[in-house]
Amino acid sequence: MSRAALDKDPRDVASMFDGVARKYDLTNTVLSLGQDRYWRRATRSALRIGPGQKVLDLAAGTAVSTVELTKSGAWCVAADFSVGMLAAGAARKVPKVAGDATRLPFGDDVFDAVTISFGLRNVANQQAALREMARVTRPGGRLLVCEFSTPTNALFATAYKEYLMRALPRVARAVSSNPEAYEYLAESIRAWPDQAVLAHQISRAGWSGVRWRNLTGGIVALHAGYKPGKQTPQ
């Protein structure tokens, strides 16, 4: 399977990511012009985690994002449904679990925080995934969604769309182990809702205080919220 369709059949998506795993981190850095490192640091900072806390890094892929989160001193586990991606990150010494975002292999109220970076867009049933994230998070615990979004400047947005549909596939052919997967990436980004719509979807799944912050002119947005309950967010 070289690429998934926009209906996002879980088996097709997992197979697609297995196919890009070998050069995934390099390809991301090249295609983002190095911005992926900044986005990971911003995610860690926005999540506001620290020593003694438990964090689930969902759709963690090769666990490069999980390693960044551990710099906070928190205990972090990487979860992904692509076994190939987890295997590609075997050298990264963090706990790793294979699992589906809509059926997480964890009990209720386990984590102080949950994050998903560039993964929610690849889940067929996003509401189910957001509810599962809430289930495994303690009351007062935090959610951070880092995802591609809609640039706020109209001229920049036009240039960005041209990059997605024209330049990105060409660059992917030069560096990726599965360049056709990046055609899916471009199409899925263009089909993804804007910041306000995603915030509404997160709230509808049971998260409170949902807000967002744009990065790189809105190419990426961080959506944050907390699980309502007796404890208050720290």
From Swiss-Prot:
A Gene Ontology annotation in the biological process aspect, one of them, is: methylation
| Membrane-crossing residue ranges in chain numbering | none
Report if keyword Methyltransferase is assigned: yes
Q: Where does S-adenosyl-L-methionine bind?
A: T62, D80, D100, A101, S117
UniProt-listed InterPro entries = SAM-dependent_MTases_sf, UbiE/COQ5_MeTrFase, UbiE/COQ5_MeTrFase_CS
Going by the UniProt record, its keywords in alphabetical order are: Menaquinone biosynthesis, Methyltransferase, S-adenosyl-L-methionine, Transferase
**Pfam families reported for this sequence:** Ubie_methyltran
The terms under GO molecular function for this entry are: demethylmenaquinone methyltransferase activity; methyltransferase activity
Naming one, the record's GO cellular component terms include: plasma membrane
Which EC number(s) does UniProt give? 2.1.1.163
Q: Does the keyword S-adenosyl-L-methionine apply?
A: yes
Pathway(s) of this molecule: Quinol/quinone metabolism; menaquinone biosynthesis; menaquinol from 1,4-dihydroxy-2-naphthoate: step 2/2
Q: Which reaction does it catalyse?
A: a 2-demethylmenaquinol + S-adenosyl-L-methionine = a menaquinol + S-adenosyl-L-homocysteine + H(+)
Q: Which PROSITE patterns match?
A: SAM_MT_UBIE, UBIE_1, UBIE_2
Similarity field: Belongs to the class I-like SAM-binding methyltransferase superfamily. MenG/UbiE family.
> Which purpose does this protein serve, as stated in its record?
Methyltransferase required for the conversion of demethylmenaquinol (DMKH2) to menaquinol (MKH2).
State any further remark. Answer: Was identified as a high-confidence drug target.
Q: Which named protein is this?
A: Demethylmenaquinone methyltransferase
What species does this protein belong to? Mycobacterium tuberculosis (strain ATCC 25618 / H37Rv)
